[in-house]
Amino acid sequence: MAELPVGLKTAHRILVEGRDVSTAILSRLIRLSVRDASGQAADTAEIELDDRGGSIVFPRAGVSIEIRLADARGRGLVFAGKVDSARSRGDRSGGRILTISAKGADVMGRAKQLQERHFDDVTIGEALRIAGAAAGIEEVRVDPDLAQISRTYLALEGESFLAFGQRLAREVGATFKVVGSRALLVKRNAGTTASGRPMGTVPAVAGDNLFSWDIAPYVGRPRHSRATARHYDPDQARHQQSSVDLDDDSTDAELIVRYGAADGAAAQDQAAASAAEVERAGGSGSVTIDGDLRAKPGALCEVRGARPGIDGDYLIDAVEHSLDRTSALTTRLDLGLPQGTAGQDARRSA
């Protein structure tokens, strides 16, 4: 196993088409990063290499790549996908740099192909599995509660499987992601995996593993007291509303979902999903900690020792693992949904 040179202290392993190239690129590696965000349909990875003399063989699009990194607890797989692009840049005095970008979803495959199909009286889980099979997806895993949500009618009208999954995720308050030949639909803000298991908590402790923080536990603009969606009721010949109240007495503004739902059940799901997004956006920020491969979008981050009003629990919205020539593995966490003592300072005002 290759050990990174001075500054790159993390044991790493990079496989291209199943071949270990860690040692071959060791002296050329400038920076490596892997990003996993709940709002994007696929994980991304980027490898930046010193391409002096143009000696590195230019990578082909669609080549498979795996990246394994190690933290204090051991090594783990952090990315599996395919090369999406390769970019060369250089100038007269700065040398040459080759940047290889990869995505967890096969963007060359049928997942991006537009489909024309519809479903009558179908569950979300069943609709995703059928559309996924047509897109070459071998396995679709859906949170058990989400899988049972039924719709009287669903359609893909010139819509890809990727777009279909993201649309359903927005409508039911979920996160959709494609990883290789698998697709996942999990609840947002629930802190659970697609099978319903708890994701755990990642600590960020000042004086221990916390490098830096930039957090605003209270953001006023996204806050609302209620989320409301509507649908047209043909029996009553008028629009009906479905609402979800939010536990926030700092505002009396109501969030109105812009587009109407197909029926009452869909409207209730849209209102609940919008309420979850409001809660998530009520605070925001980021922390950078020692490399921690346990961090996943949807898990909790417990910030301690920063200061009163900042310390507390936050939901992890995105994770980026990175290392370069000047530092060992670090993990950046984008945060939202402040909880517990976040935003509270019990000290008396001066």
Where are these regions (language model features)?
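A generic local secondary-structure boundary/capping motif
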Residues: R89-G90, G173-T175, D214-V219
